[in-house]
């Protein structure tokens, strides 16, 4: 959900005429044979985890089906692929919380679920997901747009042998404003999350339009933060550097990035959510919730909804939580039959002890209105720093 590469999102909030034409062309060019019933075929566009053989193989075997899943690390890229004609390819799309409600449903890229059939699953989830759950519903509150599963806080990660949890929570984003910390931290490559984090370091809410003064502050902060980084890399690079003592903390990060190191026996690698920050109500952290929706494919596979039901089952939900690559809490842990499957070590890996507390200190992932402008500024700062 968080290790993203540099992707252009110019005019992301506006559906272009070219993309609309591509959708129409894609449907027109679809071979006649491909329009046959797809009761043994399922295609999933998702974040890492749902593409795991651990998750897919039992479903393949049970249904005698060909199930293909492609994992990406960027929500807008997935959505733009639907816009560009792949609405005719995919059956399910798995992205972070705002996109179904704010973008994909209004653009008719996804179709509503049978609320009577699917909403009862929410009653077995953790209390925060009590139905009707905002991010799973359309603006009217009438249509169920997707199902929830993985979630978690995502601000930054520290090595508590170097920076205590208490210090990190109290200082929060100001860790990056202390000149003494230059070259003591890393930056996890993740375009959208790093834009969020740099806004927080600069002292303002990411999820609003920003005035000229804030943009100038963002520019200065991005240049300073990238110049002061010891390294920029992926999750594996960050965890290796933290464990080796090469860095003390990294931006951005959370359960999704820290859990593999913790599961490998490094409890000192810890997700941190600041106690205060620049978001509404003084909140200091940011959290994410995945929503999986059925694509508005004219030949949607009947297996799409069956797969959504499959991953709601306690045993499957536990597998999803600990699918290879990254480990995360799941909403289904509200069901005692699911929760009992988690070992003490697994609960520790996902920092269950402080999960609820940290979620309450976090604002939920949302869309940045002037994201393109800020991303261009941040990318320039990154290039400038790498050039020396």
What are these regions (language model features)?
Residues 1-11, 20, 32-33:
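N-terminal secretory signal peptides
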Residues 35-103:
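Early extracytoplasmic/lumenal segment of secretory-pathway proteins
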Residues 88-93, 111-157:
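A structural signal for short loop-to-beta-strand junctions that line the ligand-binding cleft
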Residues 290-358:
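Mature extracytoplasmic/periplasmic domains
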Residues 102, 187-190, 194-199, 207-274:
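Ligand-binding pocket segment of bilobal, Venus flytrap-like solute-binding proteins
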Residues 349-388:
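Conserved C-terminal helix/tail region of periplasmic/extracytoplasmic solute-binding proteins
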């Amino acid at each position: 959900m968080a290790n993203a590469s540099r992707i252009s999102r110019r005019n992301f909030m506006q559906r272009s005429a070219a993309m609309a034409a591509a959708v129409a062309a894609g449907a027109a060019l679809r071979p006649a044979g491909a329009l046959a019933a797809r009761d043994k075929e399922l295609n999933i566009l998702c974040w890492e985890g749902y593409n795991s053989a651990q998750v897919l193989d039992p479903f393949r075997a049970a249904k005698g089906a060909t199930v293909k899943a492609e994992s990406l690390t960027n929500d807008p890229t997935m959505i733009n692929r639907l816009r560009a004609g792949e609405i005719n390819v995919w059956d399910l799309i798995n992205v972070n919380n705002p996109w179904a409600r704010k973008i994909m449903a209004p653009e008719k890229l996804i179709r509503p679920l049978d609320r009577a059939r699917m909403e009862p699953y929410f009653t077995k989830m953790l209390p925060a997901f009590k139905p009707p759950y905002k991010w799973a519903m359309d603006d009217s509150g009438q249509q169920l747009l997707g199902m929830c599963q993985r979630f978690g806080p995502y601000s930054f990660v520290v090595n508590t042998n170097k920076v205590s949890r208490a210090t990190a929570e109290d200082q929060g984003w100001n860790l990056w404003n202390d000149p003494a910390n230059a070259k003591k931290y890393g930056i996890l490559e993740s375009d959208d999350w790093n834009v969020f984090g740099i806004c927080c370091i600069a002292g303002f809410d990411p999820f609003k339009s920003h005035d000229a003064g804030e943009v100038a502050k963002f520019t200065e902060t991005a240049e300073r933060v990238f110049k002061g980084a010891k390294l920029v890399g992926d999750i594996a690079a960050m965890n290796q550097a933290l464990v080796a003592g090469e860095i003390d903390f990294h931006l951005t990060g959370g359960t999704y990035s820290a859990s593999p190191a913790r599961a490998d026996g490094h409890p000192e690698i810890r997700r941190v959510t600041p106690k205060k920050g620049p978001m509404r109500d003084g909140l200091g952290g940011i959290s994410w919730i995945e929503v999986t929706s059925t694509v508005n494919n004219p030949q949607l596979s009947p297996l799409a909804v069956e797969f959504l039901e499959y991953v709601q089952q306690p045993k499957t939900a536990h597998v999803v939580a600990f699918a290879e690559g990254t480990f995360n809490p799941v909403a289904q842990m509200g069901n005692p039959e699911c929760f009992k499957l988690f070992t003490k070590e697994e609960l520790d890996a996902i920092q269950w002890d402080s999960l609820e507390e940290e979620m309450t200190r976090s604002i939920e992932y949302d869309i940045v209105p002037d994201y393109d402008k800020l991303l261009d500024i941040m990318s320039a700062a990154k290039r400038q720093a790498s050039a020396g």
